């Protein structure tokens, strides 16, 4: 009986271990592929916007890196004013500072247009896409972030879609009101940088409407 058991172990067990190892390894590869398929990546770019590589979004977003990641910001304008609200408390970067309504990272594989449309649809699903315009790009770096910002504006004739309980603390600001609060650590760093550009863009647009 013992000899028979030893023969089974000698002849049967090794192939079983080998087959089990293959199956376990295949399962590991399968599981890894599932995880990677659900892992979101963001592009790594240079200051011109050329894609140089990619990084796992969760790692790139939660800390400052040596590499640059592209960020889309959308300024919502209505009747010559900007809609601003406090940044979410969960934000790693400048939480509670007054800022634009929309900001998000470009996802690896997206075009700039696709990324902007995704961010707009997530926040204002009924907003007209043809009122969304790209304005300019700039590199912004401080002790907390390293980003290439693509700034868009969304012009709304009807501001009723901004009456949303999710936009806590949000309101329309005149540029004069904003100017009185510049340099007081009240607005986000990016908004402080964008202020003069946005003022010129919105002023020109409003003048064009009047003519």
Residue positions per predicted region:
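NUDIX/MutT-family hydrolases
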Residues: 103, 151-153, 162-191
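Short, small-residue-biased leader/transition segments that mark boundaries at the very start
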Residues: 1-7
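Charged phosphate-binding loop/patch that engages nucleotide di/tri-phosphates or the phosphate backbone
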Residues: 189-211
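Conserved Nudix-box catalytic region and its N-terminal flanking loop in Nudix hydrolases
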Residues: 58-72, 77-118
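Active-site segment of metal-dependent pyrophosphate-handling enzymes
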Residues: 90, 111-113, 117, 121-160
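Acidic, metal-coordinating catalytic segment for phosphate/diphosphate chemistry
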Residues: 34-73
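Transmembrane-cytosolic junction motif
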Residues: 23-36
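Intrinsically disordered, low-complexity segments enriched in serine/proline and basic residues
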Residues: 10-16
